[in-house]
Structure formats: C-alpha cells, structure tokens
C-alpha cells in the first residue's frame, strides 16, 4: 500500500480527504474515474489543515520563514515564498511520517503553491487562479483549482511512479 500524508493550508485538508474517501471506498466517490487507482492501493496516514505557522512548526518540527503579511492568525506569504514554504513543509512531513507521498499547500497573495514529494521526485506547481488572502479575493476559486490540480497530479504520479492503472 502506498502511504500519503498531507499538510494543507489553502486547500483546507481537502486533498487528503478526497484521497481518503476513495481509499476507504466511500459510496459517494465510487463513480469517480480514478477511484480504482486509489481504492485498494493507497491509504492516508494524515490529512491536516494547518493554516498557522506555529501549528506547522510544532507538529512537523520545522522552522518556517516569517510571514510576509499579517493576517489574523494565519501565515500569508508572497507567491515566491509560498513556493519555498510548500517545499519546506512537504519535506518536513515526509521526514516526520516517512510516507511514500507527502503533499503540502500554502497560499497568501498569488496563485498559491503545492508541493508533492515522492521517493523519486519533487513536484512543484501553483493553482491557475490568482487570489489574495488579505483582501479575500478569489479564495474559494483558487482553493477548488488547487485541490483539483493536486488530485490530478497525484493520479499521474500513481500511474507513472507506481504503475497503477
């Protein structure tokens, strides 16, 4: 079985939950065309929504850069720093849980960033939707796009790296 763990911010843990539902055989997702790739082959070790710097640092034993923006209790970075933070968090998650696939997401001002780390490769990408956490612009559209793009990337990884069909 392939182990997956997520530490998510702007995707609110929904990447991990979607994978978990398929892995566990929830009826509501049986008709998804990728159901058979995940069900019986993958399990989710952890799916975490971690919006705060302190939460990430405490749970994953990692130091993050100071946020670029002040936003309530959440961290908010520039696009450039979102990419850096997503990589840091995915690496810390993989090291902490020793999972096969670690997924991390973060977004402040910009398109956000997602890092998927496997034993073979690091995949870094953004959503296709610009959003601004501080102003509350396009947050849900960016989230939905990020979840879908990350899930599609996980499916491609399972096919290419693990030979699942």
Swiss-Prot record:
InterPro entries: HcgF
Classification via Pfam families: HcgF (PF06787)
Family: Belongs to the UPF0254 family.
NCBIfam families: PRK00962.1
Protein name: UPF0254 protein MmarC7_0182
Protein source organism: Methanococcus maripaludis (strain C7 / ATCC BAA-1331)
